[in-house]
Amino acid sequence: MFLNKRKAIFLISVPVLIFILTINQAKSQIIKIVDGDTIHLNGEKIRFTGIDTPELKQTCLKDGIKDPCGVTAKQILIDKIANNNVECTSEGKDQYKRTLAECFVNNESLSSYLVRNGYAFAYRRYSKKFIPDEDYARINKIGMWSMDFDYPWDYRKSKKN
């Protein structure tokens, strides 16, 4: 009887263990942070919709001192994602064939997080969704709102000329 109980426990345990390992493997992701508003998720290039972050080479001025605000925006995203899984809701593709999406970590929008922390702007040309987050950061002088800066779209335009 004792042997049969051990055998039964073993026969039940093995499938349960395999199931748990399968779930953990399914959740593993390969994430590369390109910049503040672009990631590669399992090889797919994803551009966050509704926001725009400073370019990596872009700097801001705080009390007359250059601040690498583009690099800081990327680092804030790296820190927020850390070792968490990222879930994205696709909204189609852009002209560069990137997936346009809003992405989340622990059910929190990464776009909202970046805008609210003052290192992304509501990209009003495409969406009004993140304007309240931007207003909050601006009113409270959070992140780039405590500095002199060029909007990313103005910075890109100045580099084309």
What are these regions (language model features)?
Residues F2-N161:
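Small beta-barrel nucleic-acid-binding modules, primarily SNase/OB-fold domains
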